[in-house]
């Protein structure tokens, strides 16, 4: 008489084809998705509910493994238009729930297939709340994410890869993600349901954007405000930038340690400030501008990443809900006297915006272009436009 096969719990019998190994040897197991392989980076978390395609394609995430705190990621698939850069620099992604079939009229490809195409290692079915709590309590750790259909992993080797990696501190990633060739932005505006990404051929001002890892939605907003934008690599000299005859300079977002990028970027910015041109910086651009003005930066314990960060505008005495993505900050102690703090975080009172007292120069730590996120701070683009208008009028008089 043959014995009946014992029923097994399908959930428990599932092979763990994905692992995340942290530097303290803590191992999280799940189901691998995307690209089969392994990748090492800093493990961070993002609290956004939407916009995963824009987040993953943001160059500022170079060198990082993103843990998404919202449980359902991938529901709307991916499309051909919403990339924030042409190349994906994110090291890996971690999701709580299995990706469902996409349901959206703009969807072109399943998120799993998109991750595979872009060689991004991912895991689903992982306890993202536990991982988030760990990061919150201990700080953002180094980690190695791996996916193998066999479910066989050399944990010792993965741990070794994790501990050997130097981390983001003192790492210049802007030089890796910056454009290899200067170019003029095509002029596409921000997305509208009725028109999609419509092209704008008008140009009232010429902005030169220094690319430390620029997001496309920043360029789209400049098109919304009738600006022609020339994007230059992060090591382009001030003299070469000035030959382009810009009305204003934009310092972009980007990944890595601002102090490391500052080794070449600070002198470029100092020379541009001397020319009294309007300057506007976002995120890494904000940090490098602060360094050029004599301030200092430091690595944060876990950083700010999400689309719901409240920021106090100290000039207008109001609160803006902002989109953020940064792991370094400007140190608020012993700021040079010529720097005025304009915005601060209502989470931890860290500096979120500065301006130079005697010149048309300002920057913010957060992302006014959102994508994803609220649009409370789009007015900053208008302030930059106003500075260029005033500067042009002054030159004519």
Spans of features found by a protein language model:
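RNA-binding accessory domains that recognize and position tRNA/RNA substrates
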Residues: 2-244, 256, 273, 371-373, ...
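Short acidic-glycine loop/turn motifs at beta-strand connectors
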Residues: 22-24, 138, 314-316, 357-358
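Active-site glycine-centered loops adjacent to acidic/histidine catalytic or metal-binding residues
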Residues: 127, 283, 326, 367
């Amino acid at each position: 008489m043959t014995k009946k096969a014992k029923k097994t719990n399908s959930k428990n019998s599932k092979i763990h084809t994905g692992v995340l190994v942290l530097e303290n040897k803590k191992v999280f197991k799940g189901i691998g998705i995307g690209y089969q392989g392994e990748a090492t980076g800093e493990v961070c978390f993002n609290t956004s509910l939407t916009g995963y395609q824009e987040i993953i394609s943001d160059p500022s995430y170079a060198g990082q493994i993103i843990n998404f705190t919202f449980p359902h990621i991938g529901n709307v698939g991916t499309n051909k238009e919403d990339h924030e850069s042409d190349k994906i620099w994110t090291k890996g992604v971690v999701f709580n729930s299995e990706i469902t079939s996409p349901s959206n009229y703009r969807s072109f490809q399943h998120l799993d297939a998109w991750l595979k195409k872009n060689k991004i290692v991912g895991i689903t079915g992982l306890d993202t709340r536990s991982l988030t709590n760990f990061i919150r309590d201990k700080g953002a750790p180094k980690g190695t994410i791996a996916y193998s259909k066999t479910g066989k992993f050399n944990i010792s080797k993965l741990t070794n890869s994790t501990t050997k990696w130097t981390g983001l501190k003192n790492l210049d990633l802007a030089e890796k993600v910056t454009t290899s060739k200067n170019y003029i932005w095509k002029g596409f505006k921000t997305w509208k349901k009725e028109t999609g990404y419509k092209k704008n051929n008008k140009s009232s001002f010429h902005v030169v954007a220094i690319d430390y890892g620029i997001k496309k939605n920043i360029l789209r907003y400049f098109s919304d405000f009738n600006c022609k934008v020339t994007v230059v690599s992060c090591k382009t000299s001030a003299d070469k930038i000035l030959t382009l005859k810009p009305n204003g300079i934009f310092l972009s977002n980007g990944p890595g340690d601002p102090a490391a990028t500052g080794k070449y970027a600070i002198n470029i910015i100092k020379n541009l400030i001397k020319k009294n041109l309007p300057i506007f910086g976002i995120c890494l651009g904000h940090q490098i501008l602060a360094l050029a003005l004599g301030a200092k930066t430091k690595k944060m314990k876990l950083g700010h990443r999400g689309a719901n960060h409240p920021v106090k505008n100290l000039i207008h005495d109001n609160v803006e809900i902002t989109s953020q993505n940064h792991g370094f900050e400007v140190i608020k102690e012993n700021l040079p006297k010529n720097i005025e703090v304009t915005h601060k975080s209502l989470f931890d009172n860290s500096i979120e915006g500065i301006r130079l007292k005697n010149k048309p120069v300002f920057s913010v730590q957060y992302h006014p272009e959102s994508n994803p996120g609220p649009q409370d701070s789009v007015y900053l683009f208008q302030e930059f436009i106003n500075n260029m208008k005033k500067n042009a009028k002054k030159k004519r008089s």
